Amino acid sequence: IMYLIRYQGPQWFEPQTYFGNNTLKDIYDYEPVQADWKPEYASLLMGVQASMWTEFCNKPEDVDYLVFPRLAALAEIAWTQPEKKDWTSFLKAMDIYNEHLTAKGIVYARSMYNIQHTVTPEDGALKVKLECIRPDAEIHYTTDGSEPIATSPLYKEKLAVKETLNLKSATFVKGRQMGKTLTLPVRWNLATAKPVSGCNPNEKLLTNGIRGSLKYSDFEWCSWTNNDSISFTIDMEKMEKVNTFTIGCITSYGMAVHKPRLIEIAVSGDNKTFDKAGERTFTPEEIFREGNYIEDISISLGGVETRYIRVTAKGIGKCPDNHVRPG
């Protein structure tokens, strides 16, 4: 079973829905016959299924947008043997299929042309990776805030960014823009592109210069699941005067995503001895306030001179019984 309620493309472009991705290619690549099945089970498979929940849909067109063209990929895996699958050929057929959808006035997603970005601190810079699931699409970009056109620089490899800028990019086929323009405001501060050490492999997101969106599964939020106390350390690589520490937190009440009850900052010049420099605490009422929103939580450090900043966050524990997701 697969869920069409999940995002079908880079989440920055998509209307609000459930968490996680299930792109056109994800569905096309899905293999219903699992590797650990006994050989005799494969012949008993009656078909494939995709579920479409509609709690985020307000009109029939919203449903159509989530169903089409992914329904074609579902049909493809139902009647095509795995060894005969060919993504490039499928896309050519998809172009014809989408023309039929247009002729019938059906609202469908063009998410296959949108760009997925990954920004990673590396060697003192931010390395920006741009991808599209369509191999026939070229990516053109600008760094001066202007809109990308077919004659803008062609993206060929990761871009190195070392300053605040607005990176814009879009996909083009035969000189025509096909996807939406991706706008990445890269912001630089004392922690940007600096190393982070902790227990979460995604902690590099904390210093990659990109703000997360209101979609908490957009691959720009660093999350800790079932872990009530976490800690990470930012190495600014030299002594710096720090007046304020600010961290962004997202609340998604319906998915039980909440800020911690305590954020504590400690500083060190040698990464061995740390001194407490400030903290913020939050009440249960503040933590479990309903809604879907982003907060910048600032803690004054009073101009302290430091190289290492250790951040410790402690959660409140389980959601209360009157929460939409208690426990």
Predicted region positions:
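Hydrophobic, well-ordered secondary-structure elements that form the walls
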Residues: 71, 141, 169, 245, ...
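Beta-sandwich strand segments
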Residues: 71, 177-179, 321-326
